[in-house]
């Protein structure tokens, strides 16, 4: 029987489904030939542990996405979680939606992530329905949206596709709607960038990752995860049409922006 959604948001991050997450040891031993990063079955299996030990402030962002949903989700609207992975942001939003007639659409292009996401969503009962969709987020037609989440997703798109996606998000939002855009940042000030890069590595070491694990994962990600500066993100958001865009959370070189579409909520 599905559980009622009564556990805390922090617990949802540690246990996003009916079983506890496995510890990430994917890169603990030397890998002879490192390919590019993919969100495959092995990554999906350890993803909750991996992201909590790798992304500073991740659990805070997830919790606060729920708080933002309570504030911004409008009655009879749709909410999109684009690049939903295992559904942590979806669960956080669903728990905090207080208005009627809403639906969350959670999208990811990884079959392994989608399969587990469906299990995690189905493990908890709630009033707000969720559609879990396996698709390229660029192919999703956004409509009647009051809130959209891109939680560490945009950085995995080809740079040439990023503006197009943000344009689609803006067009699909209702007046008064919000986009939450969480990303790893790079910095125009090289000294600050180096400091925060090193602090992030200290964070991973403190969470039990070895130098080998850190190095191998970085090598696999370097051609796949292409980061932007906060200034670049803001420029894109304003170009898409968002009247307001600002960082609302940051820890080291990771953070989240909120972008607002002007107008009165309907």
From Swiss-Prot:
UniProt keyword list: S-adenosyl-L-methionine, Transferase
GO BP field: tRNA wobble uridine modification
Annotated region described as Disordered, given as residue ranges: 1-24
EC assignment: 2.1.3.-
Lineage top rank: taxon: Bacteria
MF-aspect GO terms: carboxyl- or carbamoyltransferase activity; S-adenosyl-L-methionine binding
Primary enzyme class: transferase
The keyword Amino-acid biosynthesis appears for this protein: no
Protein name: Carboxy-S-adenosyl-L-methionine synthase
Gene: cmoA
């Amino acid at each position: 029987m599905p559980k009622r959604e009564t556990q805390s948001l922090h617990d949802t991050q540690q246990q996003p489904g009916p079983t506890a997450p496995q510890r990430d040891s994917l890169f603990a031993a030397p890998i002879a030939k490192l390919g590019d990063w993919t969100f495959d079955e092995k990554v999906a299996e350890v993803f909750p542990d991996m992201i909590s030990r790798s992304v500073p402030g991740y659990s805070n962002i997830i919790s606060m996405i729920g708080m933002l949903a309570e504030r911004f989700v409008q009655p009879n609207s749709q909410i999109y979680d684009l690049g939903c992975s295992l559904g942590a942001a979806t669960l956080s939003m669903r728990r905090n939606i207080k208005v009627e007639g809403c639906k969350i659409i959670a999208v990811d292009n990884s079959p392994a992530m989608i399969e587990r996401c469906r299990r995690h969503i189905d493990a908890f009962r709630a009033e707000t329905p969720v559609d879990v969709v396996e698709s390229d987020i660029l192919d999703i037609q956004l409509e009647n949206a009051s809130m959209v989440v891109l939680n560490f997703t945009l950085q995995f798109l080809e740079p040439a596709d990023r503006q197009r996606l943000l344009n689609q998000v803006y067009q699909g939002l209702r007046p008064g709607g919000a986009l939450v855009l969480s990303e790893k940042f790079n910095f125009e000030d090289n000294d600050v960038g180096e400091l925060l890069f090193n602090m992030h590595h200290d964070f991973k070491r403190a969470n039990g990752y070895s130098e080998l694990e850190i190095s191998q994962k970085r090598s696999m990600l370097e051609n796949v995860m292409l980061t932007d500066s906060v200034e670049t993100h803001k420029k894109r958001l304003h170009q898409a049409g968002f009247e307001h865009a600002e960082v609302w959370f940051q820890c080291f070189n990771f953070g989240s922006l909120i972008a607002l579409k002007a107008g009165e909520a309907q």
